């Protein structure tokens, strides 16, 4: 699938499953308690995050998908905290409130980026009335849903998931399952089931080879009538079995792994969102793999925007050491170029509508060194700087046009309002800005100069500006 700016905003996905509140107490430790041989943590901050199925819903919302979340919570303050976290992100919460169960809460005490202890507040109660109440809400939500995700953490919400899958099938809504436990028959009839390797081998037994895994996966898919089965294998990548097609394998997209927290939630969220857009399992798996590779390279539970995901896929489709590269991949190429004695020039901007003034400016900038980098503001960054009607052209279109300019070697992107972070990350040899700047007012100039680089101010060609073009065209 060629990279395209995926528009998830007209899609609605229903998430059903075990919702949790992840709570973090952060503080310093400097002494041992006189009461027991344990550290004393002086709590300085408290952080609340959606967890479990709620994290899946949050990930979808950050992709730009319209999301409804259904789950069981207690009639307590933590349920209200969780709902506020989610609703602030645009998630519609349809919680079933229990008078006898608490909201599942996992409290982690953290100090110096290390977890000292985790306290779990949870109880399980499989009741007919709870299952019926849940089914009623799901049935109400299905008609407006493009897909449903069942996020099972074996905490009791999906005790009767088979009935919910039957409801989704009756409504002709595809269902995607992130499973748990040692009985996958409860997921019979689902569209796609996504176990990790450990969960898969719990069902089928240890697999001594990829061939054996594929054979067992094929048999399991056929046994339970799934259209597709996706086995995630960590550093060994993913394997997809769908319909009567040959197994489809992908190597992991992760280059560095800092934290796998929430990676499975990211996979099922992106997988489902892309599938409802493309209707192709392979496309969905390719995007999900890249998204997982991105989030495991971040500390803590991370998510990914549609814009960043599309930029990553755009770069991947070009598969070259020049052109559009992520900041991390670009840094590798810069180091190689500098080892070869090449001087790296950097400039940045929105470049919403490329005009002759831009082209002349790029030629001047390139003449100051051997390689020219152009860093582009993402769409969200442009909106913050220029207003809600901008950009006229989305990030992928802007980078694609810049990539075709002969004087430009590399194109990358940044999310922030200023290029300070990306300049400090890449540390070019020459920093260039156009217009009425002075060196003292150029963002990142101090960093480049401190590292022995140069800062240059170029004059723009008179008579050209993006704003005047937009005004003339009444855009």
Curated annotation (Swiss-Prot):
E.C. numbers: 2.7.1.167, 2.7.7.70
Pathway annotation from the record: Nucleotide-sugar biosynthesis; ADP-L-glycero-beta-D-manno-heptose biosynthesis; ADP-L-glycero-beta-D-manno-heptose from D-glycero-beta-D-manno-heptose 7-phosphate: step 1/4; Nucleotide-sugar biosynthesis; ADP-L-glycero-beta-D-manno-heptose biosynthesis; ADP-L-glycero-beta-D-manno-heptose from D-glycero-beta-D-manno-heptose 7-phosphate: step 3/4
Binding site for ATP: 196-199
Residues at the active site: 265
Highest taxon in the source lineage: Bacteria
UniProt-recorded Gene Ontology molecular function terms: ATP binding; heptose 7-phosphate kinase activity; heptose-1-phosphate adenylyltransferase activity; phosphotransferase activity, alcohol group as acceptor
One Gene Ontology cellular component annotation held by this UniProt entry: cytosol
Keyword Nucleus: no
Uppermost EC category: transferase
Pfam families according to UniProt: CTP_transf_like (PF01467), PfkB (PF00294)
BP GO terms, sorted: ADP-L-glycero-beta-D-manno-heptose biosynthetic process
Region Ribokinase: start-end pairs: 1-320
Stretches for region Cytidylyltransferase: 346-475
Catalytic activity: D-glycero-beta-D-manno-heptose 7-phosphate + ATP = D-glycero-beta-D-manno-heptose 1,7-bisphosphate + ADP + H(+); D-glycero-beta-D-manno-heptose 1-phosphate + ATP + H(+) = ADP-D-glycero-beta-D-manno-heptose + diphosphate
Keywords: ATP-binding, Carbohydrate metabolism, Kinase, Multifunctional enzyme, Nucleotide-binding, Nucleotidyltransferase, Transferase
Protein role: Catalyzes the ADP transfer from ATP to D-glycero-beta-D-manno-heptose 1-phosphate, yielding ADP-D-glycero-beta-D-manno-heptose.
Self-association and partners: Homodimer.
Family: In the N-terminal section; belongs to the carbohydrate kinase PfkB family.
UniProt protein name: Bifunctional protein HldE
Organism listed in the record: Marinomonas sp. (strain MWYL1)
UniProt lineage: Bacteria, Pseudomonadati, Pseudomonadota, Gammaproteobacteria, Oceanospirillales
Primary gene name: hldE
């Amino acid at each position: 699938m060629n990279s395209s700016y995926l528009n998830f905003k007209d899609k609605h996905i229903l998430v059903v499953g075990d919702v949790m509140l992840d709570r973090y107490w952060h503080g310093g430790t400097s002494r041992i308690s006189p009461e027991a041989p344990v550290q004393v943590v002086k709590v300085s901050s408290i952080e609340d995050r959606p967890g479990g199925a709620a994290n899946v819903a949050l990930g979808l919302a950050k992709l730009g998908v319209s999301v409804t979340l259904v789950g069981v919570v207690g009639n307590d303050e933590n349920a209200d905290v969780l709902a506020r976290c989610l609703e602030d992100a645009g998630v519609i919460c349809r919680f079933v409130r229990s008078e006898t169960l608490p909201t599942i809460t996992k409290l982690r005490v953290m100090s110096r980026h290390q977890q000292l202890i985790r306290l779990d507040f949870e109880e399980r109660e499989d009741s007919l009335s709870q299952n019926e109440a849940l089914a009623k809400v799901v049935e109400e939500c299905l008609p407006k849903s493009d897909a449903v995700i069942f996020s099972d953490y074996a905490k009791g919400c999906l005790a009767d998931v088979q009935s919910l899958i039957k409801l989704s099938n009756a409504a002709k809504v595809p269902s995607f399952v992130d499973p748990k436990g040692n009985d996958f028959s409860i997921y019979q009839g689902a569209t796609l089931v996504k176990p990790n390797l450990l969960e898969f081998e719990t069902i089928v037994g240890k697999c001594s080879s990829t061939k054996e895994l594929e054979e067992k996966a094929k048999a399991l898919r056929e046994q339970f009538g799934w259209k597709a089965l996706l086995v995630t294998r960590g550093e060994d990548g993913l394997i997809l079995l769908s319909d009567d097609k040959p197994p489809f394998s992908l190597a992991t997209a992760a280059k560095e792994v800092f934290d796998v927290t929430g990676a499975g939630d990211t996979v099922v969220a992106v997988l489902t969102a892309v599938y409802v857009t493309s209707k192709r399992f392979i496309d969905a798996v390719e995007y999900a793999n890249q998204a997982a590779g991105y989030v495991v390279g971040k500390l803590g539970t991370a998510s990914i925007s549609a814009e960043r995901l599309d930029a990553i896929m755009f770069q991947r489709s070009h598969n070259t050491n020049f052109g559009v590269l992520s900041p991390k991949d670009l840094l590798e190429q810069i180091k190689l170029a500098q080892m070869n004695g090449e001087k790296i020039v950097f400039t940045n901007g929105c470049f919403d509508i490329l005009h002759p003034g831009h082209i002349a400016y790029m030629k001047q900038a390139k003449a100051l060194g051997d390689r020219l980098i152009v860093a582009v503001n993402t769409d969200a960054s442009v909106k913050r700087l220029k207003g809600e009607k901008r950009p006229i052209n989305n990030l992928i279109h802007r980078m694609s046009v810049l990539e075709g300019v002969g004087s430009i070697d590399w194109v990358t992107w940044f999310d922030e309002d200023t290029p300070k972070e990306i300049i400090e990350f890449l540390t070019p040899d020459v920093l260039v800005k156009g217009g009425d700047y002075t060196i003292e007012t150029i963002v990142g100039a101090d960093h480049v100069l401190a590292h022995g680089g140069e800062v240059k101010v170029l004059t723009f060609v008179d008579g050209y500006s993006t704003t005047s073009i937009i005004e003339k065209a009444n855009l």
